[in-house]
Every structure is written in C-alpha cells, then in structure tokens.
Amino acid sequence: VFRSLPVTTLFIDGNHENFEQLNSYAVEQWNGGKVHIIEDNMIHLMRGQIFTIDGLKFFTFGGAYSIDKMSRAEGISWFPEEIPSREEYEEGWANLEKEDFQVDYILTHTAPRDVAAAMGYGELSDDEVELRQYLQRVADKTEFQKWYFGHFHEDAEVEEVFVCLYDEVVELS
C-alpha cells in the first residue's frame, strides 16, 4: 500500500516490530538524524534523534513494553530490542541538550509516566518503568508544541499537548 502513495512515509518503531529485519538496514543520516531507509519513500526515524522537516524540529523515540510478550516467541513475534538501549537513552538526551531542549514536536510510541497514568495505564515491568520515567524527564525538561504517541490503541488527549493517536490522523504544520 505505502509503495503506491505519492508521499514519503516516515515512521518510528513500536514494540511489535521485527527488529532483526529493521536493524539490518544501513544507518544513514537524513534531515539531521539517524534513519533506516527501507525504500526511497519509506524511512524509519531512529530513537533519540532530532529531525528538521519543513523548518520544524521533531524529537523521535520509539519502543515500548509488550504486555503480551509471554505469549510471543522471541526472535519471531517478540524482540528484546522493543525496549531502548542505554546508548539510545543517552544519545536522545545528548541530542536534546544540543537543541537546548527545544523542539516543535515529540513523536514516541509510548507515553511519559504521568500521561500514561492519567490515561489509566499502570506500569508492568522495570523496563517499562525506566522508559516511561525517561520520557517523563524529557517532558519535564523540553519545550515543545505537541507530543504524539500511539501505544495504547485509542484516540485521547491529555493536558492539550499530549495526544494519543490510533484511528485519528492529524496534519502537522
């Protein structure tokens, strides 16, 4: 479907990706950050990167914890890389520091701790706690217009700046 669209599709990873395949692509630089170019019109925006697109700055940080990982097979339907590495956390923070913690938009798969809690989602594992805590520190320190995420499979808004997308499509400008 995406191949036939007259646009370039940009995406961040979630928690059900085949990370072995995704990470088999060469890491390249694109609009200021690291990417995997899947095809000419399909680009994976890697974790902890800042991209300038049409004059707007985007911080990206994919990944999330799979609550159903016990029913999945490692390396087939579940990959430990769903949780960010120490290097990804550190690189993301360093990239935000370079921008004085000022971006236009933040795109993540899961939400910061306080936002997830406001939506009624508790924490299920130490890995999930660490990721949501990291995103909470990013939220507390960074100036941004909107933060978009989607892990919870619902359309919702928290405090007018945190937006969970599932069925809804928004245009950023």
Task: Report each predicted region and the residues it spans.
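Short His-Asn-centered micro-motif
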Residues: I12-N15, R47, F61, T108-H109, ...
